[in-house]
Amino acid sequence: MSPSLTWHDVIGQEKEQPYFKDTLAYVAAERRAGKTIYPPQKDIFNAFRLTELDQVKVVILGQDPYHGPNQAHGLSFSVLPGVPAPPSLGNIYKELVTDIPGFQRPNHGFLQSWAEQGVLLLNTVLTVEAGKAHSHANLGWETFTDRVIAALNEHREGVIFMLWGSHAQKKGRIINTERHYILKAPHPSPLSAHRGFLGCKHFSQANQLLQQQNQQPIDWQPKLPAVE
């Protein structure tokens, strides 16, 4: 792949597609009607802003954004500083404590430092109405995020996809396992984490796979931005 390829190059044309315009128009109309939609408009595409196509090493696929106040900011599983880690993220931390030597459970749930190291924190659906999980399913976001996965599949090699739960695993069916790595486990939600997410060791496995490709491993200890 030429290092100059960007998200704009490979999925920029999606913005011109009717399905994509319709999705954005629906979300804009809901906001105008006074509904609270998460994340804020400026944050919807943060995952792509923070992790450029040629920087992606790992993909962690989520479902739809958190639907509580001040949680979602465009990165799957991550919440804004000052907001307690939701239960699924709590289980991710629990797994990291046992999987990564020296990992300390943070007192926040802000995963931007992962994104800045090449972990694409991608939700399948990029918006949600406050308090209503899956309220923006089947609007068109799934088509867009399928194109994102297809672009990674085609234009990159050696990317590690962490697919947690049946939803993510279905979404990952198009990934060519001769070019990429797939790590599967149950979802980290409290309903399913004990069925094999806890103990999956995906984080250490990902770092081993990166090192085998002579790439820098991920520092999985989430860091808050330095206060200016």
From Swiss-Prot:
For this protein, the record's InterPro entries field holds:
UDG_fam1, Ura-DNA_Glyclase_AS, Uracil-DNA_glycosylase-like, Uracil-DNA_glycosylase-like_sf
Q: Name one GO molecular function term.
A: uracil DNA N-glycosylase activity
Q: Which residues form the active site?
A: D64 (proton acceptor)
Main subcellular localisation: cytoplasm
Which GO cellular component term is one of those annotated? cytoplasm
What is the annotated signal peptide range for this record? Answer: none
What family is reported? Belongs to the uracil-DNA glycosylase (UDG) superfamily. UNG family.
According to the entry, what is the taxonomic lineage of the organism?
Bacteria, Pseudomonadati, Pseudomonadota, Gammaproteobacteria, Enterobacterales
Q: Which CDD domains match?
A: UDG-F1-like (cd10027)
Q: Which SUPFAM superfamilies match?
A: Uracil-DNA glycosylase-like
What reaction(s) does this enzyme catalyze? Answer: Hydrolyzes single-stranded DNA or mismatched double-stranded DNA and polynucleotides, releasing free uracil
By what name is this protein known? Uracil-DNA glycosylase
Keyword entries, A-Z = Cytoplasm, DNA damage, DNA repair, Hydrolase
What HAMAP family does the record tag this protein with?
A: UDG
Note the SS bond partners. none
Has the keyword Flavoprotein been applied to this entry?
Answer: no
Please give the PANTHER family that the UniProt record associates with this protein.
URACIL-DNA GLYCOSYLASE
- What are the EC numbers? 3.2.2.27
Where found in the cell? Cytoplasm
* Summary of the function given for this chain in its UniProt record: Excises uracil residues from the DNA which can arise as a result of misincorporation of dUMP residues by DNA polymerase or due to deamination of cytosine.
* Gene field: ung
The UniProt entry's GO biological process terms, in alphabetical order, are:
base-excision repair, AP site formation via deaminated base removal
